[in-house]
UniProtKB/Swiss-Prot annotation:
Alphabetized UniProt keyword annotations: ANK repeat, Repeat
Keyword Transferase: no
Pfam families named among the record's database cross-references: Ank_2
Family matches, as Gene3D superfamilies: Ankyrin repeat-containing domain
Name of the protein: Putative ankyrin repeat protein R846
ANK repeats mapped onto the chain: 41-69, 81-110, 111-140, 142-170
Cell inner membrane in keyword set: no
Signal peptide: none
Amino acid sequence: MDNTYYQLPLELWVKIVDYTDEIYLLLTNKSFFELLYLVNVKMDTIKYVVENNLSDVLKHIVELKNINHPIFDKDIITLESLNKYLKKSCKYGLIEIVKYLIILGANIKERDNIAVGKACENGHLEMVKYLVSQGADITVDNNYSIMKASSNGHFEMVQYLINEGADITA
């Protein structure tokens, strides 16, 4: 696939992707992906990457951020999208995805630490431990996290939250 990229001018690749209005082609090759800032696809890139559990693509996005790639000059990767899919990734226990979203700037404390609450509610103990290590507050919103963990029968989670300072009487 690497050779295919160089067989056509960039302008033609941009036209092909714009015509199909899908980013799937851009995910087949790192060189293709870097064209994302040139196309007019109306798709939420982070949504697609997270919903398909493409942690390698997120890793590449982090690499692009580290070199100040033009992909970050346009609103292709937005804080709103990062925060939204951080919450969803916590809900489904996608810890590798969560790590990359945080590196990209997702806010674990957004909306009263809802991300850690979703992880507690769904029993993802390793996720909760990671979020706490990154500064998530398990006591906000009247100890929402322990309330959700206990109401869903995640007793090991409840024990961990108590050890971390959650208030069972709240």
